[in-house]
Swiss-Prot record:
Keywords: Cytoplasm, Magnesium, Metal-binding, Nucleotidyltransferase, RNA-binding, Transferase. One of its GO terms (cellular component) is cytosol. GO terms for molecular function: 3'-5'-RNA exonuclease activity; magnesium ion binding; polyribonucleotide nucleotidyltransferase activity; RNA binding. Its EC number is 2.7.7.8. Its main location: cytoplasm. Residues 621-689 form the S1 motif domain. It is found in: Cytoplasm. Component of the RNA degradosome, which is a multiprotein complex involved in RNA processing and mRNA degradation. Residues 552-611 form the KH domain. The lineage of its organism: Bacteria, Pseudomonadati, Pseudomonadota, Gammaproteobacteria, Pasteurellales. This is Polyribonucleotide nucleotidyltransferase. The gene is pnp.
Length: 715
């Protein structure tokens, strides 16, 4: 085994590509490394096409092995299970730029598997996996029009940073991944801390320029180690069948695309398909339905694109830069913490915001360790949203991807834990869909968060742009329909505030999209975003002043970190008793910050008072109220200050002689006591002599005591 190795510098990192030693029965295999983060990528391509196959069956799987980080998986089975959300998102990140580079009509099955086998906590494996997949596909000999490069771009101290480390990413105002060929950008995925359109475009151009070193080195690697190129030839078009279908369907399809209502248009198109299939298969039984449908789809594309390029109205009658009619309702669900329905044309999202406590945060087990996520965003796309029946179950890849994009759009305006100590979950239920449901989710989420009283920094809106390009002519479309997305050349989603962009996602199906075209699309998207924000601001101009009556109220107080163990108690007994007796939820941070969540304000105040009792220091000569916890022959033990026990000796119960303690005291009895002494072992001696229930007791120590305003803050 003589492996072939290619090594090169990529920004501040060293990239190594190796092939020929492992997985030699795969069509191609590459071990890709970047500074100790290593991803093993394999490609298997079938030489034969399945009979009746009428689509390109490309599968991309990305999997992380815990041994890569020197860890053993948790759980009962102690092995990796189904893909996590993070793994699914990275699989999509690899898939999106490579899929458009396979030729039309190529239907051979291809599977790409990327396995993380070693991880340096400072280097994210997603970029390494993308480079490895590009190299493996290029080596395999399949008709892949790559290679592609991939780059991550950060923005630190007003400078673009190529492939920042994870430490640098924490201080970066931008996390942008761009992939493309030597000639064109194909895919962008990003989140930003409210940057301008010009800064976002500059980041895309910067990343594309920098990744050329990857593309050049993969080309050299292929010259040295690549397999012979497949002699695949695109199937010859069936001209006779195309002409037959055109004669029967072209005029009718043109008329159908004058129907502006989606369902009525689809019914007409389906009727045309059924009629043409029936006529042609009756004449010739060897003609496949799939071939007829492919020709009709091509006719649809030609008609719609031709009209747009010619300057005619779009499918639903709009001009190129018109946003569909908007309708907004907030506070639509009575018992939820915040809700909104956002409708844009035939796309509608029901967004619901829920406030929770620290214990509701999601613990994410990553290769580099556990992390906590305080903002959750879930996107659901039920089949009824497009008038279909279908399976209901765990979220699909598309739902996970759309949810993450919408989350990226809103994340930049979310308050910090110090500003708003709640965990927040937003769920977007897509109730109708005809294009741009992820951007409707951004708008709906912003409205629902404001309805819930979450102090977001600004309202956020999202818009999906499209592009139709024929040779030198091109048209940028605002607020695309589902058909325009399917038949167009670009899907370009932008979310942001009035001040700038918070998220950008781009998928381009053709080469030749210049920075100038992207600039036009960004500027047109900005105009659409401002229009949507104006309508949203009329519906709800600012976050509600107060949270819902049904949301938990979080009160915070500070205690001495050394006293945390006293509040928790042995085996959690004290804190458990507090929560059970008052119906509250209590979280304590290592710095002594105590967060009490309760729907009843009085219950929260009672808990705070009791915690103050627990952490307060017992003072000699101070007088307290307490409860008798035990009666013994030589006296009684009394609990003061929320659990500290002291002894009232038999001689200190009264000035008279006491024969039996039980004659004077019983368990549970409330008494007034004075602290006589605290010895070196912190044992407390108490007396009841010369005291009665009218004697003034020390302040801020009883259950009824109020906590000072400096020690609590009600959020």
């Amino acid at each position: 085994m003589n492996p072939i190795v290619k090594q090169f510098k990529y920004g501040q990192h060293t990239v190594t590509l190796e092939t020929g030693a492992i997985a030699r029965q795969a069509t191609a295999a590459v071990m890709a490394s970047m500074d100790d983060t290593t991803v093993f990528v394999t490609v298997v391509a079938k030489k034969e096409v399945k009979e009746g196959q009428d689509f390109f069956p490309l599968t991309v799987d990305y999997q992380e092995r815990t041994y890569a980080a020197g860890r053993i998986p948790g759980g009962f089975f102690k092995r990796e299970g189904r893909p996590s959300e993070g793994e699914t998102l990275i699989a999509r990140l690899i898939d999106r730029p490579v899929r458009p580079l396979f030729p039309e009509g190529f239907f051979n099955e291809i599977q790409v598997i990327a396995t993380v086998v070693s991880v340096n906590p400072q280097i994210s494996p997603d970029l390494v996996a993308m480079i490895g997949a590009s190299a493996a596909l290029s080596l395999s000999g399949v008709p892949f029009n790559g290679p592609i490069g991939a780059a991550r771009v950060g923005f630190i101290n007003d400078q673009f940073v190529l492939n920042p480390t994870t430490s640098e990413q924490k201080i970066s105002r931008l996390d942008l991944v761009v992939a493309g060929t030597d000639k064109a950008v194909l895919m962008v995925e990003s989140e930003a801390d409210i940057l301008s359109e010009e800064q976002m475009l500059s980041a895309v151009v910067f990343g594309h320029q920098q990744q050329q070193v990857v593309i050049e080195n993969i080309k050299e690697f292929v010259k040295e180690a690549g397999k012979p190129r497949w002699d695949w030839v695109a199937p010859e078009p069936n001209t006779a069948l195309i002409n037959q279908v055109k004669a029967l369907a072209e005029a009718r399809i043109g008329d159908a695309y004058r129907i502006t209502e989606k369902q009525a248009r689809y019914e007409q198109i389906d009727a045309i398909k059924a009629d043409v299939i029936a006529q042609l298969t009756t004449q010739d039984e060897t003609i496949s339905e799939g071939a007829i449908i492919d020709i009709i789809t091509a006719l649809e594309s030609s008609i719609v694109r031709g009209r747009i390029i010619a300057g005619e109205p779009r499918i639903d009658g709009r001009t190129v830069d018109t946003v569909r009619a908007l309708d907004i309702c907030t506070g639509v669900l009575p018992r939820t913490h915040g809700s909104a329905i956002f409708t844009r044309g035939e796309t509608q999202a029901l967004a619901v915001a829920t406030l929770g406590t620290e214990r509701d945060a999601q613990i994410i087990d990553e290769l580099t360790g556990e992390k906590s996520d305080r903002f959750l965003f879930h996107y659901n796309f039920p089949p009824y949203s497009v008038g279909e029946t279908g399976r209901i179950g765990s979220p699909k890849r598309r739902e996970i991807g759309h949810g993450r994009l919408a989350k990226r759009g809103v994340l930049a305006v979310m308050p910090t834990a110090e500003e708003f100590p709640y965990v927040v979950r937003v769920v977007s239920e897509i109730t109708e869909s005809n294009g741009s449901s992820s951007m409707a989710s951004v708008c709906g989420a912003s409205l629902a968060l404001m309805d819930a009283g979450v102090p977001i920094k600004a309202a956020v809106a999202g818009i999906a742009m499209g592009l139709v390009k024929e040779e030198e002519k091109f048209v940028v479309l605002s607020d695309i329909l589902g058909d325009e997305d399917h038949l167009g050349d670009m899907d370009f989603k932008v979310a942001g505030t009035r001040e700038g962009v918070t998220a950008l996602q781009m998928d381009i199906k053709i080469e030749g999209i210049t920075p100038e075209i992207m600039q036009i699309a960004l500027n047109q998207a900005k105009g659409a975003r401002m229009h949507i924000l104006s309508v949203m601001e009329q519906a709800i101009p600012a976050p509600r002043a107060d949270i819902s009556d049904f949301a938990p109220r979080i009160h915070t107080m500070k205690i001495d970190p050394k006293k945390i163990k006293d509040v928790i108690g042995k085996g959690g007994a004290v804190i458990r008793a507090l929560t059970e007796e008052t119906g509250t939820s209590i979280d304590i941070d290592d710095d002594g910050t105590v967060k009490i969540a309760a729907t009843d304000n009085n219950a929260a105040k009672a808990v705070m008072a009791r915690i103050e009792d627990i952490v307060a220091e017992v003072e000699v000569n101070a007088i307290y109220k307490g409860k008798v916890t035990r009666v013994v022959d030589f006296g009684a033990f009394v609990s003061i200050l929320g659990g500290k026990e002291g002894l009232v000796h038999i001689s200190q119960i009264t000035n008279e002689r006491v024969e039996r303690v039980a004659d004077y005291l019983s368990v549970g009895q409330e008494v007034t006591v004075k602290v006589v002494e605290i010895d070196r072992q912190n044992r407390i001696r108490l007396t009841m002599k010369d005291l009665n229930n009218d004697t003034p007791v020390a302040e801020n120590v009883t259950e009824e005591a109020e906590v000072s305003s400096e020690q609590q803050a009600e959020i």
